[in-house]
Amino acid sequence: MTDPDSYRSSITSRPSFNRTVTSSSQNYGAPGSGNRVLKIVTETHSSSVSSGLSPYGQNAASTIRDNREREKKEIMELNDRLASYIEKVRFLDAQNRKLDADLKMLQGRFGKSTGSVKVMYEMEITTATNVVKQTGKDHGETEKEIRKLQDQLDELRKKFEEAQRGRAEDRLKIDDLLVTLSNLEAEINLLKRRIALLEEEVARLKKENFRLTSELQRVRIELDQETLLRIDNQNKVKTILEEIDFMKRGFETELKELQAQAARDTTSENREYFKNELANAMRDIRAEYDQIMNGNRNDMESWYQLRVQEINTQSNRQNAENNYQKEEVKRLRNQTSELRQKLSDLESRNLLLEKQIEDLNYQLEDDQRSYEAALNDKDAQIRKLREECQALMVELQMLLDTKQTLDGELKVYRQMLEGNSEGNGLRQLVEKVVRTSAINEEADTETMRVVKGEHSSRTSYQRSAKGNVAIKETSPEGKFVILENTHRAKEEPLGDWKLKRKIDGKREIVFTFPSDYILHPFQSVKIFARGQGIANPPEVLIFEGDETFGVGANVQTILYNNKGEERATHIQRQSQQTTSS
């Protein structure tokens, strides 16, 4: 029998625990026998998600996400209830075995130290009462903390709703700015098109001006040639006139000689004949000469007048066209300058609007991330407190049930110790000492055999990420590792990133991504060890360095970027435990 002075109660409140069971593979053994494997997954993930989908895509994504969250919560509640039932059954089973052993011990040794049994159970009742009071006090503090956190959550929800309204207003403002930007871009394109047309017109006019200038130059060259030809002809006329004068003088000299000869001729008939012939010849020569001179003079005058008239007409037309082209070029230059000035103003305004839109988008994303992070933290705290409160309530109910059971058993023990009205209770128990001792030994042996057959294996996972890339899953057998990009619209370049896997703090396996590898939004990549899968880039890669990523009781998988910074972690811990009462 245990000494009452050294006896310590075994009734204590169960340690608080955070139940975040999200694994879909759980194996619960039957109460009191077999192996029990409980897989606990704790995920910590922080990432920035920007809204890059259309409203219909966002509604569909939010609906799917809500359904998944609701299903996960239902699974978590069912897992909690199942674990609670199993733990309650095991606890009651162990409690029954302990009480049965105590009862048999008391029955076997009754009459030797009955007073110590009473002291032991009074200590048990006192300890259970203190535990109930302490549990009630913890329950009240937890309720106060929950109400306080509920107020903070309401305040944060109000702020979040205000942020949502501000976000909607910013969206409307952004839409208006986008409409304005589109109009400005359309106007800019129209002005650019007009400028291009005007530049084409200016080029055409320049070509026409060059053609007319070339034509004018050609006409001037022809005029110079005609002028030179006229001067040449005038010189020829002068030369011919001089020749005519010379011939006239020669003819006159010859005529005088003939007259002198005729004068020397004494015959009057001969003199008259020669005189008439000479007069006729001179008249014919003079008439022919005058006719030739008049014809040449008329031809030259008509030709020169025609050429001068043509040159004057072309010169006047060319001057008029040049003046019109100069005016048109001046007008086009002024219009081009005005359009370029307006285009510069519109481009400046466009840059300002784009800068404002970019600033508003950054501010909106920062506000959304901060509010979502705050709400997630508060929701996690409230969920944790509720789980603790629920566990305390279950524990309190179990303690109350235990107290009631102990009260009933104490009442029975008192009746057994005090005996009935005939006073034969103690005597009957003393007579059964030898027989109950044998039964007690047999029961203890069987109980130890059952307890030694119970083993529990506990595997826990913990994930964290500092960005959009997270370690989604690792194979417990070391066959593969899966990474995912949680962002909706942003690509993540993973070139030269390293995936390190540490096995029990001893072995280290390193996989390096290709230098040009990019992980697309909402996509995942599965990395197989050598011989464990078939390569299908970019969705499936093969690690040629080893046939396995390694297995162990403590496995750490860490993702580093090309600068050596830690971006994501995945920790797997496995422990096996043998329990006995």
Curated annotation (Swiss-Prot):
Region described as Coil 1A: spans on this chain: 75-106
Coil 1B as annotated region, ranges: 121-258
Record-linked InterPro entries: IF_rod_dom (IPR039008), Intermed_filament_ifa/ifb (IPR016451), Lamin_tail_dom (IPR001322), Lamin_tail_dom_sf (IPR036415)
Cell compartments where the protein resides: Cell junction, Hemidesmosome
Molecular-function GO terms, alphabetical: structural constituent of cytoskeleton
Head as annotated region, ranges: 1-74
One example of a Gene Ontology biological process annotation: heterochromatin formation
Domain LTD: 457-574
GO cellular component: hemidesmosome; intermediate filament; nuclear envelope; nuclear lamina
Chain segments carrying region Disordered: 1-35, 47-68, 449-469
Domain IF rod: 71-424
Keywords (A to Z) from UniProt: Cell junction, Coiled coil, Intermediate filament
Region named Coil 2: 277-424
Function: Cytoplasmic intermediate filaments provide mechanical strength to cells. Essential protein, involved in attachment structures in epidermal cells that connect muscles to the external cuticle. Probably acts by forming hypodermal hemidesmosome complexes that help mediate muscle-cuticle force transduction. Although expressed during embryogenesis, it is not required for embryonic development of muscle-cuticle linkages nor for the localization of other proteins to the hemidesmosomes in embryos.
PANTHER family xref list: INTERMEDIATE FILAMENT PROTEIN IFA-2-RELATED (PTHR45721:SF9), LAMIN DM0-RELATED (PTHR45721)
UniProt similarity note: Belongs to the intermediate filament family.
Name under which the protein is recorded: Intermediate filament protein ifa-2
Source organism of the structure: Caenorhabditis elegans
Protein encoded by which gene: mua-6
